[in-house]
Structures are given as C-alpha cells and as structure tokens.
Amino acid sequence: MLLLKHLHILPMAGPGPMNGDILLENGKIRALGRELSAPGAQVLELEGLYAMPGMVDAHCHIGMWEDGNMIEGDDGNETSGPITPELRAIDAINPFDRCFAEACAAGVTACVTGPGSANVIGGQFAALKTRPGSVEDKLIQAPLAMKAALGENPKRVYAAQKSSPQTRMATAALLRRALLEAQAYAKKRAEKEGADFDMAKEALLPVLRGELPLKIHAHRADDILTAIRIAEEFHLRFSLEHCTEGYLIPEAIRQAQDAGAKVIIGPLLMDRSKVELRNLTFQAPKLLHDQGIEFALMTDHPVVPLQYLPVCAALAVREGLDEDTALKAITLHGARAVGLEDRLGSLEPGKDGDVAIFRGHPLDVRSRCVMTLIDGQIVHDQR
C-alpha cells in the first residue's frame, strides 16, 4: 500500500478539486479523502503538490516512428497496398524507444498507438502504459481499434505509385469494398462448406460485429462527413480522428456523437503542412465544446512529442477553453474516446493507480511533473 498525503487533487470525477490524500493498493486506487490512514502503508508527504490522473493520449504513433531514426525505425505505414487490416501495431512497436520514458516523466501514463494514415485501412491500434519494459509489460489492450484514413494521405501515397486510390471517390470505394467483402466472407464462413481463411478479411470481422471501433483519419469537413456516412452504412462503432474542420460542421458532429461516435482532436501544435490543414486552429476545442461536443486531445506523436500533451491542453485554454474541460480532454475524455474509462482517466476507487504529481498547476507550462505512478508503482521521481 502507498499513501500520498496532503495533495491538491484534480480527480476529473465527482464533486471536483479537493485537498486530501490518495491511497493506492494492489495497483489500484483504493480511496481518496482527507487525513486517510492505512496501517502498514508507505506514506509520502507531498504537501502543496498537485495530483491528477495519469494523462491519456488517445491517438499517437509512439514506438512506430522511433525518435532519431529514419527508415530503420519507420514502421508505421506499410505502403505495399492500401488495404492492410491484418497488420498489428504490437508487432512493430519498439517499447524501448526513449520517448516512452519522456512521456512517463511528463505524467502521460497511457497512450493509444498504431499505424499511420498512408493506407485506406492501415491496421490495428493498441493501448499501452508508458512504464518501462516490453510491449507485453506495457500492454493494456490489443487490438483496441482498427485504423482507416480518408483525405490527402492515401491519395498522395498511391498516386505516386500510379495505383488506386488517387481520388477521394476511390478511397471511399476501397473502404466500402473491403467491408463488403468481409461481410461476404463472414457469410460464407458460416455456411456448411465454409470459405478459405483470409487473414485480412478475418481481421475486419470484429469491426463489422461492433466489437472493434474504426479510428477514421479525417481532417477536412467533407472527409469527416464521408467517415460518418460509411460508418452509418455499416453500423460501425467509430471515432473521428483529427477532426480538424469539425468545428465547421458541429451539427453533424453532434448527431454522430449522440449516436455513439467519439471525437479526438489534433494535433494542433503544428504547421499547416498540407491543404487539408488550412483551417487548423487552437480555437477548435472551445468551438466544439460550446456546441456540446465531447472530445479528447491527441499529440499524433511524433508530430507533437507525446510529453507535450499537457501543453496542447494549456494552449487550448489560452484560446478560451475552460481548464476543467481541457484537463478532461487529456484524461477522462481521452480514456472515454478509446473505451478505457473503466480503468483510466480519473482518480476514483477501483481504477488503475495511474497518478501524475506536479509542482504547480498541470496546465501551467512552467510546472514540472515531479512524480509519476503507474499501477500504483512509482516509475518517475524527481522530487
């Protein structure tokens, strides 16, 4: 048992901020309260420091594009074909990439990482803790989601190869075809004579059954609407990834969210490096929040280094978003966006003992994370 004493606690659930203690036991949060006692527990006096849930990045590519490497550590896009649902992030992640340690030291304790957006269907994402160790040591869930992409990226990659897709029409058609072929495959597999095993089609069956959400990369408003259209056609669970121009079509986003879609915004701390980013703005979080839309913030690491997730939230506050919503966008709403809110994202009894402790408010860019705990264990300590 570990008892953290006399903290300013930002629990992201319940009645709100409080001054008090956090008791951790067997990797979980056991209790929050004032002047807690626990015979036999290790006690840490942390008066004046801030405690918040370990942060959650709902979309990144950590370990897939390794820091400081080029092709040697570039394992995020398999560009031999545009439909590759059978690919698994866990087979490409380098768990010893130093960026995991840097994220952990910044208070980011969980991340969702996977293939990039070169392919119409790119493969399977995984959720990891940022603790030291192998993929198996870090693993929360795999697969967590299936990656799909609309817009410029698949067009650019395959036009250069003089193959399909070269237009948005072809991108949407390839996505539909893959889903339709997987449906037909499932039907034939269920029949008496069966069907020959197909690894790619097999990988799409959990998506069609609603067991695995589709993470759909879409920046431009029309691509976002295409993502919604196709997901609704096939009755899929899905999330809108990046959603850069989502603030231009709030009614469509809200209707999709009311039907179960998740929204993950970002990366915002970047240049407008392509045409579909021309309406990129840090005002987007506030504009969506004002329309009643819940969202998470992402770094899209390595686009924005994972350790700067709280900086992204702070800059959204500078542009008018309230602090509570900004913090939730990198904690509870991040966990909710990827279906892990039962374990992550808030300081509540029964949830994983993932805690980030700061000297100063976490959204003050001058503040430093002085301690990080994952599953109740201290994995970073700079007090």
Where are the regions that the model predicts?
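His/Asp/Glu-enriched, well-ordered alpha-helical/loop segment
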Residues: 67-68, 72-80, 84-85, 213, ...
